[in-house]
Every structure is written in structure tokens, then in C-alpha cells.
Amino acid sequence: MKQYFTKQENNKSLILFFTGWGMDQNTLSINKKDFDTCICFDYTDIDFEKSHYKNYQAIDVYGWSMGVWAASYTLQSCNLPIRKSVAINGTIFPIEKERGIDPIIFQKTIDLLNEQSLLKFNKRMCGSKENFQFFIKHSSLRSIESLKQELISIQSMVKKDMTSTFQWD
């Protein structure tokens, strides 16, 4: 997992944002007064360096889409001073027919991923032309191969029954 500080000014509070699949540090910009900000992305490797956060007194966690699963798994044993945790359009069961993405759809996404299918995916995700135009200005610069590897890695990790005890507010 990549952990990228978009704002690091030695504040006592931190916004820790776990993005969805395929994103990078360009995906969003948060500039809240008295908060540092760290963006987590690329779940090809789920290793999480908790030492980055040892000096914070309060951490607000946000998980979006696949980031809900990534945050749930990585934060459950970190013992960080989490003040609040907000899950946005995601699940701790990312590849599951009833509570996540149908495994057949997930596999087809891996098998058929290319520039055109990614564009179609992003348009559907955004929901409107206006949202899509905004998203494109801030979209990930990662390669198709990188995105595919991330999906394959997530699929492999989920098959290992990586259940979580992390609690969302």
C-alpha cells in the first residue's frame, strides 16, 4: 500500500483517507485547518507502515469503495488514536455476491481491463457527466497493468479470508 502525505505540517490531528481501487495521490485534495492529510492507495501490497502516525493525538479515518476493506484490514491491529471512522460506498466484504462485488464480475473486470473498459467503469462510477469531467481532472496516473495487478492482488488476499474486527462509526 502506498501512503502519501498531501499535507504534513506537524499538526496533532490527521485525516487518513483510504481511496478506492485504481486511485493514487492525485485523486483528492483535502486541506482542513489543523489537520495533516495522508492518502492510502494501491492495494497491490497491503502492508501498512503505522509508524508514520505515532505522533498524532487524533486520527479521522475515511474509507471509500475498496478503501473500506483496505482500512478495515490494516487498521484492526494498529492501536492508533482513531477518533472517527467513516465508510463511504464500500464494504469489508469486497468480493462476495451478496455484500460486495460478485466474484464473476470481479474476474471479468480483471480479464477485460483495458483503456476503454476503464473509461466505461469510471463514467459509471461518477454517475453524471459533470462528476466525470471533475474526476478526469483528478484521475489516477497509474498504468492499466498496475491497475490489473492491484485487482489480482486484492482477489488473492480476499481469498485468504482476511476478515476484520475494525469498527466503522
Residue ranges and their predicted role:
Residues 165-169:
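Catalytic His-Asp charge-relay segment
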Residues 62-72:
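Gly/Ala-rich beta-loop-alpha elbow adjacent to hydrolase catalytic centers
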Residues 105-109, 119-130:
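Helix-loop "lid/cap" segments that line or gate small-molecule binding pockets
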Residues 30, 73-77:
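Active-site signature of alpha/beta-hydrolase-fold catalytic machinery across serine-
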